[in-house]
Amino acid sequence: MTALLETPVRRSRRDWRLLWSAGAISSLGDGAFLAALPLLASTMTTDPQLIAGVTAWGTLPWLLAALPAGALADRLDARRTLSFVQLAQALLIGALAVLVMLRSGGILAVYAVAFAVGLAETLAKVSGQRLLPVVVDPAGLEKANGRQNAALFANRQFLGQPLGAFLFSVAAGLPFWVDVASFLVSALLVRSLSRSAPGVADRRALRSEIAAGVRWLASHPLLRTLSLLAGVANLANFLAMATFVLFVRDRLGVSDAAYGVVVALTGVGGVLGSFLSARIVGRFGGRRTVLTTLFVTPTAMIVLGLYAHDIVTLTALASITTFSASLWNVAVMSLRQRTVPAELMGRVASVGLLLAFGTQPIGALLGGLVAGWWGLAAPWIVAGVVRLVAAVASLRPLTRWPTSA
């Protein structure tokens, strides 16, 4: 824990610890929420397409609202915005917890809350990306991003998801109350930061501000390619993961509580990759690291779909994918934070997030269809093939990666 909290390159040790702690605590609640939501849906239906709909509705806001969220984030104070949005998310999830306890609502209520929480998350995500470069110097971005990623994987998958699944097996509303508490504490910590990324006064119409971010990213061949690759990767990832709860329960025959343990074990690679990311990127460079992940991840996904018939094989292969994802995230996020002008960070980040996350609901819906047509293993194979094709197509543009990054 001490190593995680050590300031990467000092601007404010206190602010770094507050920001890291806020992310770590909210990730714990997110994990409980993400484990409990599909389990809650599975008590209402066993239809793969309806189960996948939970993920689709939760990620649809990225397709609809990412660009306006980025423009708004650049206008608003990042610290105040993030803390306010987290309070709103606590209120929304608290409402779902009450419905669960009263045994009212149904799959449509789950969809509605997933959508509303996802809508708030678009603004929270962009505001959070604006805060880190204020707290950490550019030379420490890889280390800071790696430590934030490590906290996210460890708390969301190792702790949050098993906790959420276990609490759901005890009382269905409990994991949602854990998420409410995590958002409240995180909002308080963010509000306590002494530094922030202030809003940029701009009298232009919101549409013009959005267009400025789009033009900047479109004119940068490397970041444009990486954003498109992230979109394809997330489409494929959600195609595979949308029916994962059914894949694990039907193929491995595990209980609800054991499902959370399986999900936690798949995050081993993510935590390890986050700890090692700064060292690996520093040793081999961002370009070589990203190119390696582009081919390792889809290969592991295809093998998982074909041969994962036991927990050991499944978690080993899934850990390879999460290890690669951590390296990718740290290398690409650090490059973006180092390259994009501060006054455009929210808008450019939101365009990248639109391309990366806007494909998630499409992938989730396709995952439900593919699983319904060809079985629960098919989404992993299809997703791996899609990512391999994208990797081959991106080889030439990635030669533009700067040697200093």
List each language-model region with its residue ranges.
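Alpha-helical transmembrane-bundle signature of multi-pass membrane transport and export proteins
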Residues: 1-405
